[in-house]
Each structure stands twice: as structure tokens, then as C-alpha cells.
């Protein structure tokens, strides 16, 4: 009978020693599993934060670009207005007074045609016929005195020749009005001042 007791006592220590080994294995396995877990909430919040900052920066860039485009036409308009005002002021100082319309510009080397009549009516008829017959410019009408009136035209030589002939023919049809008709193909430059109209009133 003493042998079974010894066997039971020898078996019990073996069982008690196996338990601590299992608990140690469990302790070793659990920390390994815990270290493998990942904090997903932190990464998700960081991603959402980066997306929100990206959206905000994109929106800020768009608003700044729109403001720049809106300000550009205004600045251009201001520059153009300033440039126009500056050019106007600069050109305003350089503007020359226009020449008198009553005094035509005499060009040297252009033919001169003259018709002198007795009375005003033949002179008007001659001037009308000359300007209608050819491309000439009526430059002067002078009261000579004693009822004589002189009309002068300028233009190319052929045009002045045709105009004076037409004026003389028209003047002869109005009574005995024609006194003289003459053409100078190229008046001298010293004669030019004498051709300017004097705007003298009718003389008795």
C-alpha cells in the first residue's frame, strides 16, 4: 500500500509544474499580438486633415487668381486713361493754330488764270464757268475800281487753260463784260504775295 501513495505524490508535482509553463506561453503570446495592432483612427484623422488643408489651399489660390484677374482690367484702364491724358496734354502744347480758311495756301509752280470783267455779274458768271469746266481753285476776287472786277483761279496748266477759255466765253454772253483774260503757267515766287486777296470793299 505504501507504493501507490508514492506514485501519486510523484505525479502531482509534474502536474503543478506544467501549469506555470502554459501561463508563461500565454503571457508571451499576448504581448506579441498587442504589438501588432495599428492605430487606424490616428492615420484617418491625419489623412482627413491633409485633405482639408489641400482643399483650403486650392480654394485660396482660386480666390487670389480671380482677384488678380478682376484687378488687371482696372489697372489697364487706369494706365490707358493716364496715357491718353498724358498724350493729350503733350499734344495740346504742340497744337498749332489752323491757318485762316480765307487765305488759301499758294503753291509755287502752279498755273494762274485771271479774268477781268466790267461789272459784278459777268465776274460771277466767269467764276462759275471756270470752276465747273475744270479742276481749279478760285483763290481771289478783287474789286479793282471803276466797276472792274478780277477773278483768279489756280491749278494745273491744262485745267487752268480750259477754265479760262470757258470763263471768257461765259462772260461774253453776259453783255459787254469781258475786259481781259490771261494765263500764267508758272508764276514767279516774288509774284505770289501779290496774288493774296486783300479783302478790300467795293470801290466807287
UniProtKB/Swiss-Prot annotation:
Compartment annotation: Carboxysome
Region (Disordered): 1-102
Keyword Phosphoprotein applies: no
Cross-referenced Pfam families: BMC
PROSITE patterns per record: BMC_1, BMC_2
Amino acid composition bias (Low complexity), ranges on this chain: 1-14, 41-84, 92-102
SUPFAM superfamilies: CcmK-like (SSF143414)
One GO BP: photosynthesis
Cellular component aspect of the GO annotation: carboxysome
Principal localisation: other
MF-aspect GO terms: structural constituent of carboxysome shell
Domain BMC span(s) in chain numbering: 111-196
InterPro entries: Bact_microcomp_CS, BMC_dom, BMC_shell, CcmK-like_sf, CcmK/CsoS1_BMC
Family: Belongs to the bacterial microcompartments protein family.
Subunit structure: Homohexamer.
Record's function text: A probable carboxysomal shell protein found only in Prochlorococcus and Synechococcus strains that grow in low light.
Protein name, as recorded: Probable carboxysome shell protein CsoS1E
Originating organism: Prochlorococcus marinus (strain MIT 9313)
Amino acid at each position: 500500500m505504501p507504493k501507490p501513495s508514492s506514485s501519486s505524490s510523484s505525479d502531482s508535482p509534474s502536474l503543478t509544474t506544467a501549469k506555470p509553463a502554459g501561463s508563461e506561453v500565454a503571457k508571451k503570446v499576448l504581448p506579441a499580438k498587442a504589438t501588432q495592432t495599428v492605430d487606424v483612427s490616428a492615420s484617418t484623422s491625419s489623412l482627413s486633415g491633409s485633405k482639408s488643408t489641400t482643399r483650403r489651399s486650392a480654394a485660396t489660390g482660386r480666390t487670389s487668381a480671380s482677384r488678380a484677374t478682376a484687378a488687371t482690367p482696372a489697372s489697364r484702364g487706369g494706365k490707358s486713361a493716364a496715357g491718353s491724358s498724358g498724350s493729350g496734354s503733350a499734344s495740346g502744347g504742340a497744337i498749332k493754330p489752323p491757318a485762316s480758311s480765307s487765305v488759301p495756301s499758294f503753291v509755287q509752280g502752279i498755273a494762274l488764270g485771271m479774268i477781268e470783267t466790267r461789272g459784278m455779274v459777268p465776274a460771277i458768271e466767269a467764276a462759275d464757268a471756270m470752276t465747273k469746266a475744270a479742276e481749279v481753285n478760285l483763290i481771289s476776287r478783287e474789286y479793282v475800281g471803276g466797276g472792274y472786277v478780277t477773278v483768279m483761279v489756280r491749278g494745273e496748266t491744262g485745267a487752268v487753260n480750259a477754265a479760262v477759255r470757258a470763263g471768257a466765253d461765259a462772260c461774253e454772253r453776259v453783255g459787254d463784260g469781258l475786259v481781259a483774260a490771261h494765263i500764267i503757267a508758272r508764276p514767279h515766287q516774288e509774284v505770289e504775295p501779290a496774288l493774296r486777296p486783300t479783302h478790300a470793299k467795293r470801290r466807287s
